[in-house]
Amino acid sequence: MREIVHLQTGQCGNQIGAAFWQTISGEHGLDGSGVYNGTSDLQLERTNVYFNEASGNKYVPRAVLVDLEPGTMDAVRAGPFGQLFRPDNFVFGQSGAGNNWAKGHYTEGAELVDQVLDVVRREAEGCDCLQGFQITHSLGGGTGAGMGTLLISKIREEFPDRMMATFSVVPSPKVSDTVVEPYNATLSVHQLVENSDETFCIDNEALYEICMRTLKLSNPSYGDLNHLVSAVMSGVTTCLRFPGQLNSDLRKLAVNMVPFPRLHFFMVGFAPLTSRGAHSFRAVTVPELTQQMYDPKNMMAASDFRNGRYLTCSAIFRGKVSMKEVEDQMRNVQNKNSAYFVEWIPNNVQTALCSIPPRGLKMSSTFVGNSTSIQELFKRVGDQFTAMFRRKAFLHWYTGEGMDEMEFTEAESNMNDLVHEYQQYQDASISEGEEDYEEEPQVENEE
């Protein structure tokens, strides 16, 4: 059955990954050591999407954990679900990439990459019918960004026809973790545009906002943020793991969501998000889910879809929901917000239904949107990149690892092209093609 191999690279990737495994182990009724003690047969029916069954009724995640320093791995191993993972699947170096993309991509990471690929190969060989890969990483650091993109391109070479989904934490506008973030992110996007099939953009600041505004947490920890991300990750793949009337998988999602191959950067959202105290005061209904799902405050990337237009979007509902109600609500939303959808893709909302809700909820929905407003995010990083690159600040760290300035220039122009492509489709209208022909003869007459 359609298996997925999961990779997590770098500190951020490993922490999000750990939260993700915690979430789906819970959904499938597995405890911290991979032993099943759930209640429903449906939980076990398709555990093999993410888990291998070992001897003694133990389920082992099909996960490869990669980092260039042992610290984060030790933390995962010592965590509540540390005994879940196969010990051979921890692949780590000793040196660390020190937030340097070049170290992750060309020097330190390149030394470790074959070891990782061996593990990936072994996991892929154990699959009946491999659906694809998912990788969690950040774009601002060294290992997740540099080595993560290296792994993606290597896996792409070896498994060209399998889906490659990435959950990428993009640098946030106000909260910067490292000074060289714009460099690392631009170099990474340059790779992702070419090698990934779908990239779910997540950003820490938007997650902070959701935690403070919606969940009413006064000082959210990274644990809270990662929990939000894992809810979305679980939602995106829920159709693979549980039966439903209208299923979708990574490939169907990509076919429905990516109108042009380079434009595969998605915004994600999740509903219902309610603060811990307010849980008991609200009934979760389909209209409310749809409402909250399309709320700009609910998006996990810091770009406001009202500044752009949706090319396509997809909604995945979980729980006991009536098909008709969902269809009506989605149509309703599209009519209300018709200004924010491009009119040259009719019916651009895809819906999927899955009958099993996440733990502790009656129903929930996951939103994935391909909006042209994501260009704000790239534009912002691009501007910061240009400001630093013009002065050649911090460049010696990268050239010292054998990188060339040309690569930076290429990455910069690729990023700018991406922004322009989004802009072009945002401005496009249905009748454009016809108008062009009418105007051309007039131009000649004027001359």
Curated annotation (Swiss-Prot):
Keywords: Cytoplasm, Cytoskeleton, GTP-binding, Magnesium, Metal-binding, Microtubule, Nucleotide-binding. It holds the Pfam family Tubulin. CDD domains: beta_tubulin (cd02187). Its cofactor is Mg(2+). It is found in: Cytoplasm, Cytoskeleton. GO terms for biological process: microtubule-based process. GTP binds at residues 11, 69, 138, 142-144, 204, 226. Mg(2+) binds at residue 69. InterPro entries: Beta-tubulin_BS (IPR013838), Beta_tubulin (IPR002453), Tub_FtsZ_C (IPR008280), Tubulin (IPR000217), Tubulin/FtsZ-like_C (IPR037103), Tubulin/FtsZ_2-layer-sand-dom (IPR018316), Tubulin/FtsZ_GTPase_sf (IPR036525), Tubulin_C (IPR023123). One of its GO terms (cellular component) is microtubule. Residues 424-447 are annotated as: Disordered. Coiled coil: none annotated. It comes from the Eukaryota. Tubulin is the major constituent of microtubules, a cylinder consisting of laterally associated linear protofilaments composed of alpha- and beta-tubulin heterodimers. Microtubules grow by the addition of GTP-tubulin dimers to the microtubule end, where a stabilizing cap forms. Below the cap, tubulin dimers are in GDP-bound state, owing to GTPase activity of alpha-tubulin. Dimer of alpha and beta chains. A typical microtubule is a hollow water-filled tube with an outer diameter of 25 nm and an inner diameter of 15 nM. Alpha-beta heterodimers associate head-to-tail to form protofilaments running lengthwise along the microtubule wall with the beta-tubulin subunit facing the microtubule plus end conferring a structural polarity. Microtubules usually have 13 protofilaments but different protofilament numbers can be found in some organisms and specialized cells. This is Tubulin beta chain. It comes from Uncinula necator. The lineage of its organism: Eukaryota, Fungi, Dikarya, Ascomycota, Pezizomycotina.
